[in-house]
A protein has these predicted regions:
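Extracytoplasmic/peripheral linker and loop segments enriched in polar/acidic and small residues
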Residues: 352-355, 405-416, 444-514, 534
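Surface-exposed binding/hinge segments that line
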Residues: 132-180, 184-204
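N-terminal lobe/hinge region of extracytoplasmic solute-binding protein
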Residues: 40-90, 118-121, 191
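Periplasmic-binding protein-like
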Residues: 297, 301-341, 385-389, 493-504
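Long beta-strand-rich cores associated with HINT superfamily self-processing modules
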Residues: 512-534
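Ligand-site clamp/hinge motif
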Residues: 219-271, 403
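Ligand/substrate-recognition segments at binding pockets and active sites
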Residues: 205-207, 245-246, 264-266, 362-438, ...
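Structural transition elements
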Residues: 196, 327-367, 383-388
Length: 534
């Protein structure tokens, strides 16, 4: 019998033996009292501008320090957040918004309507829903310091939904002097109006970041409800500790050095469940859809046959055994609209086969003219499920004669490299794996995966004009049944040109100390208000 390092680790943990804790945590353990929460997120924060980047960790940062005009409640209905009052004209073309009282920036200056106008304009440069909004806008303008209007060329019933969407990049409101710069240039000030203030003095890039309670933040009067309602902060400080090794992060949790681990090792779920001081908690009940993004701009995936090869190659069940070995947390997904949305369907899914179809994939690569070009797969070493999925994918590609090469880095390095549109010889890439909330796949106007507008689309830059013409109809379709019909047509085209490849769906619980309660259960983002620590 072969005993692996992981087997030994599980045995030592089950016996109550703490693993070595990073010295930085031992030295700072006095900080983790009841008024301080220490969290290990699933990735290191390397990009701070939540409009510049769609990375989830950057959006979490944005949710802490910025605020939003509208927010989704627990039933996914948009509710006013920074907005105090709003109304729409009889012809449904002019919306008027008035900010609520008590809004101020962390530098003590007041939030104004001009900040909101600039922020909407910047966000709309990069968010799919925002781009749709700008296509319909006649004008967006400040009326006075607290009031602004959006005038439309034609009615857009989804307008408030778009402003409240949690599809990244989220519409976080920034100071006008920050939001006036193009979305392609990073904002570095980290000054928002949200419930937490970024502590610049305690920032240790690559090691830890601290967020302090904004004592001047005035939450709404309503009870907290999803991302909506009053954002009440019950602790003085949140510290994000960057612990790249998942086993070490878990050991720190078990030893009480941290309170929250976003991505605990899947094979340690039973250990966590049996620990009287720890709990697993699923924050996104809809789950996450794993997605393989291919670079449409470079060989071999500029050829549709090569993309179709990937569709046939993938064995979702094998990937799920790696990423979600407990079947209660994982299942296949074949619809671009996910498993849990009203628009999930089986149109054009004949390619799906238990175990995949490697021989068909080999033939399609041959028809694509594949000639041994290097296929570079970006692999984040600090996100276990993506790391392991990339490892399995590379091995599967090599078995059918594809020259697959892994490019390991941390998640921050992957985020930077995936923006490179050049060939692999110039630091580009061929494939990376990521995920998005299944819930978000029900809105193709905002879902980053479902945009196929070429170089204006999300990383991978899929392009198909026929599909995009159908997607453009989505906001104006009146009934649920009509949208379901449109969804089938869109999916039929998508799986022909293969805008991406879905790898399966999983629910990813966080691990926390039982002393930490009140964590908001919503898709996509981790909110840090409402938490309490005993």
């Amino acid at each position: 019998m072969t005993i692996t390092r992981r087997d030994l680790m599980k045995a030592s943990i089950a016996a109550g033996t703490a693993l070595a804790i990073p010295s930085v945590l031992r030295a700072q353990s006095g900080l983790a009292g009841p008024r301080t929460v220490r969290m290990v997120m699933g990735a290191d924060l390397s990009v701070f501008d939540p409009i510049f980047s769609t990375a989830g960790i950057t959006a979490y940062h944005g949710l802490a320090i910025y605020d939003t005009l509208f927010s989704l409640d627990s039933k996914f209905m948009p509710q006013p957040q920074m907005v105090g009052k709003w109304g729409v004209s009889e012809d449904k073309k002019t919306y008027t918004f008035e900010l609520r009282d008590g809004l101020s920036w962390h530098d003590a200056t007041p939030v104004t309507a001009a900040d909101c106008v600039a922020s909407i304009r910047r966000w709309s440069q990069v968010n799919s829903g925002g781009k749709l909004l700008m296509e319909r806008i006649r004008d967006i303008s400040k009326k006075d310091d607290k009031t602004f209007t959006i005038e439309l060329k034609e009615p857009l019933g989804l307008l408030i939904d778009l402003l409240a969407s949690v599809s990244t990049p989220v519409l976080f409101i920034m100071r006008a002097k920050d939001a006036d710069r193009p979305a392609t240039e990073q904002v570095t000030a980290n000054i928002g109006s949200g419930p937490y203030k970024f502590n610049h003095d305690l920032a240790k890039p690559g090691a830890s970041f601290a967020y302090d309670r904004n004592e001047k933040y005035a939450p709404r009067g309503e009870a907290s409800d999803g991302y909506a309602g009053g954002k009440v902060v019950n602790v003085d400080r949140i510290i994000w500790d960057n612990i790249g090794d998942e086993q070490t992060a878990f050991a720190a949790l078990q030893a009480g050095e941290v309170d929250f681990v976003e991505g605990p090792p899947v094979d340690l779920y039973p250990v966590i469940e049996s620990d009287p001081n720890l709990a697993l908690q699923v924050l996104d009940k809809s789950g996450y859809d794993m997605c393989l993004r291919m670079n449409f701009l470079q060989k071999p995936f500029d050829n549709v046959k090569a993309r179709q090869a990937m569709l046939h190659l993938i064995d979702q069940e094998a990937l799920l055994r790696v990423t979600a070995p407990d079947p209660k947390y994982g299942r296949p997904v074949t619809s671009i609209f996910g498993n849990t949305t009203p628009y999930s369907n089986d149109e054009n899914t004949g390619w799906f086969k238990k175990g995949g179809n490697p021989e068909m994939a080999r033939q399609l690569f041959k028809e694509a003219g594949y000639a041994g070009e290097k296929v570079v797969i970006l692999q984040p070493a600090n996100i276990a499920w993506i790391r392991d999925a990339a490892q399995l994918l590379a091995a599967t590609l090599r078995k059918i004669g594809v020259n697959a090469e892994l490019a390991p880095s941390d998640w921050g390095g992957l985020v930077k490299r995936r923006a490179n549109k050049g060939p692999v010889e110039s630091g580009g890439w061929s494939i990376f794996i990521t995920n998005d909330s299944d819930y978000l796949q029900g809105d193709p106007t905002s879902a980053i995966f479902l945009n196929a507008s070429g170089e204006k689309a999300w990383f991978g830059w899929p392009k198909n004009d026929e599909y995009e013409a159908l997607r453009a109809k989505w906001p104006d379709v009146g009934t649920l049944e009509e949208r379901k019909d449109l969804a089938r047509k869109m999916q039929g085209i998508w799986w022909d040109f293969v805008g991406d490849v879905r790898l399966g769906q999983f629910a990813q619980p966080i691990a926390r100390s039982k002393a930490l309660t009140g964590i908001i259960e919503m898709p996509q983002l981790v909110a840090m208000w409402n938490m309490q620590k005993a």
